[in-house]
């Protein structure tokens, strides 16, 4: 059962569109990676689309986020350009980082996407600094840290929650608990079953939501955003979810997880849940869904064509853009 939303129908349909865009982008990225067209490594966000979409739907254009190694969904949910994203995955000059960052290091400061980070928990400190900057700016901005259950065991998580709570920084800490850090089950490394319980140690709210229910995620994030904007300080939100794919997209990669567990979570598909809700409300039919899918696939084909037509970075530019000035 998905949460009953009190949102305009057009906003609900936009949430579905974002989630479908993330799913189709990831499917194409995986296929192109396995075909040898994308370099480096790809971590798919399939199954977790409701988290990025629900949180980013509660944000304004001036709010800032930071992502993880599994970051394509956050970029798309925050409004990133598909052409530049795909070009970056393809390692082309027209990509967000001129083809030098790849899948794990996409950034677009203009939309408030401060980047993704290949180091587990590496972004938490950076975005907490952005929260301090937002507080000092005094314009009501908030900062959002996305991270996984594995990162919640790292030092930066605890250090940043402590300082954010002490200084009442306008922060949202979003734990995407997909139950595994790479191939290690959270149950094997967490003394408590809920990451959100750790919020009590810092005197801040710890909220648990169904990470497959985009409306529940939105409601929790929206309440936390309102609290942060009003000076109430940070909130830790734990989104219980699941990644459908292995840790990375690799041909022949063994998945240590129980197949029955994977299939059980796939039956709780976050996209199917929101589709069903919109149909029940009379806000979506087959024609509208097919039109939405068609637009998304056309945009992805255009993004791939843009990437393939773009040049690779030149070797003599390898050290360009290392420093800000």
Language model segments and positions:
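Charged, compositionally biased N-terminal leader segments and the immediate start
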Residues: 1-14
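N-terminal glycine-rich anion-binding loops that anchor highly charged ligand groups
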Residues: 17-33
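Cofactor-binding active-site loop characterized by glycine-rich and histidine/acidic residues
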Residues: 27-30, 37-167, 185-191, 196, ...
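Short gly/pro/ser/thr-enriched loop/turn and capping motifs at secondary-structure boundaries
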Residues: 73, 179-182, 216, 243-245
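Conserved thiamine diphosphate
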Residues: 135-139, 191-223, 267-293
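A short, conserved beta-to-alpha structural element at the edge of catalytic cores
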Residues: 167-187
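A glycine-rich, aromatic-flanked flexible loop/lid motif
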Residues: 167-169, 187-203, 240-252, 267-270
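Glycine/aspartate-rich loop-and-adjacent alpha/beta segment that forms the canonical ThDP
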Residues: 227-325
């Amino acid at each position: 059962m998905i949460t009953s939303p009190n949102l305009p129908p057009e906003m609900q349909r936009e949430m579905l569109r974002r989630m479908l865009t993330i799913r189709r982008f990831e499917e194409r990225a995986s296929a192109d990676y396995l075909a040898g067209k994308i370099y480096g490594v790809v971590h798919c966000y399939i199954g977790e689309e409701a988290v990025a979409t629900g949180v980013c739907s509660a944000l304004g254009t001036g709010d800032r986020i930071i992502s993880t190694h599994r970051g394509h969904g956050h970029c798309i949910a925050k409004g990133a350009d598909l052409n530049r994203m795909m070009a970056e995955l393809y390692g082309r000059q027209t990509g967000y980082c001129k083809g030098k960052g790849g899948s794990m290091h996409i950034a677009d400061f203009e939309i408030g996407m401060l980047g993704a980070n290949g180091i587990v928990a590496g972004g938490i400190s950076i975005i907490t600094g952005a929260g301090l900057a937002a507080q000092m700016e005094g314009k009501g901005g908030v900062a959002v840290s996305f991270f996984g259950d594995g990162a919640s065991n790292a030092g930066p998580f605890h250090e940043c929650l402590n300082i954010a709570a002490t200084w009442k920084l306008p922060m949202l800490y979003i734990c995407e608990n997909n139950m595994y850090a790479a191939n290690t089950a959270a149950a094997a490394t967490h003394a408590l079953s809920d990451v959100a319980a750790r919020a009590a140690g810092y005197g801040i709210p710890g909220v648990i939501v169904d990470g497959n229910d985009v409306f529940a995620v939105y409601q929790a994030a929206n309440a936390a955003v309102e609290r942060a904007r009003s000076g109430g300080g940070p909130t830790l939100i734990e989104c219980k979810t699941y990644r459908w794919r292995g840790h990375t997209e690799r041909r022949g990669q063994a998945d240590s997880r129980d197949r029955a567990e994977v299939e059980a979570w796939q039956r709780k598909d976050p996209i199917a849940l929101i589709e069903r809700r919109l149909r029940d409300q009379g806000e979506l039919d087959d024609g509208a869904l097919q039109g939405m899918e068609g637009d998304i696939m056309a945009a992805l084909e255009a993004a791939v064509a843009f990437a393939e037509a773009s040049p690779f970075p030149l070797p003599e530019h390898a050290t360009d853009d290392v420093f800000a000035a």
